[in-house]
Swiss-Prot record:
UniProt GO cellular component terms: extracellular region
Keywords: Secreted, Virulence
Statement: the UniProt record of this protein carries the keyword Cytoplasm: no
Expression triggers: Expression gradually increases to a maximum at 7 days after inoculation of pepper leaves.
Motif (Conserved undecapeptide motif I) on chain: 1-9
Family: Belongs to the Necrosis inducing protein (NPP1) family.
Organism: Phytophthora capsici
The keyword Protein biosynthesis appears for this protein: no
InterPro entries reported for this sequence: NPP1 (IPR008701)
The organism's taxonomic lineage, starting at the top: Eukaryota, Sar, Stramenopiles, Oomycota, Peronosporales
Function: Secreted effector that contributes moderately to virulence during infection by P.capsici. Causes only small yellow areas at 3 days after inoculation of host C.annuum leaves; these areas expand somewhat and became necrotic at 7 days after inoculation. Leads only to chlorotic areas, without necrosis at 7 days after non-host N.benthamiana leaves infection.
Protein name as catalogued: NLP effector protein 13
Length: 136
C-alpha cells in the first residue's frame, strides 16, 4: 500500500474538507522473490476503490505502477491508474518511521480522512480493496 496525504480535499468552491488520505494497493504474487509479478492495482477514490486485475501493460513501468491524482469534479479528488508517464516518488516504509511519527499518524485527528496504513485501518482497507473475487 502506497499512501499520500493532502492538506485539503476541495475540488470546487464551497465543497470539500480539510485533510485527505488516498492510497493505492499493488497486489503481487510473492513478496519473498526479488522481482514479484504485479497481479493487480487498486487505487482509492475518496472512500471507494477501482481495480485493474491484471493492470493494463501501459499502466506498468517495469516493477512500478503508474498512478495519477485527479479531481473528480465537483465532489472530490481520487487516485487512478494511468498510462501517462511521470516521476518516481521516494518511498518511506512504515517500519522506517520513528515511533513518534507512527504515533502521530495513528493518534492525530484527521477529521473525515482516515490514515490507511495505521494499525487500526490497514487490514480493513486491504479487505475492502481485495480485487480477486469474494472480499476477505
Amino acid at each position: 500500500m502506497y499512501s499520500w496525504y493532502f492538506p485539503k480535499d476541495s475540488p470546487s468552491t464551497g465543497l470539500g474538507h480539510r485533510h485527505d488520505w488516498e492510497h493505492v494497493i499493488v497486489w503481487i504474487d510473492n513478496p519473498e522473490v526479488p522481482e514479484p509479478k504485479i497481479l493487480g492495482v487498486t487505487p482509492s477514490a475518496h472512500s471507494g476503490y477501482s481495480s485493474q486485475v491484471p493492470p493494463d501493460a501501459d499502466k506498468v513501468d517495469g516493477s512500478s505502477v503508474k498512478v495519477k491524482y485527479l479531481s473528480k469534479w465537483p465532489i472530490n479528488h481520487a487516485l487512478e491508474s494511468t498510462g501517462e508517464g511521470g516521476d518516481f516518488q521516494d518511498l518511506i516504509m512504515w517500519t522506517q518511521m520513528t515511533d513518534a511519527a507512527r504515533e502521530g499518524l495513528s493518534k492525530t485527528g484527521w477529521g473525515k480522512a482516515n490514515v490507511p496504513m495505521v494499525d487500526g485501518n490497514f487490514e480493513a482497507k486491504l479487505g475492502k480493496a481485495w480485487p480477486f473475487g469474494e472480499k476477505k
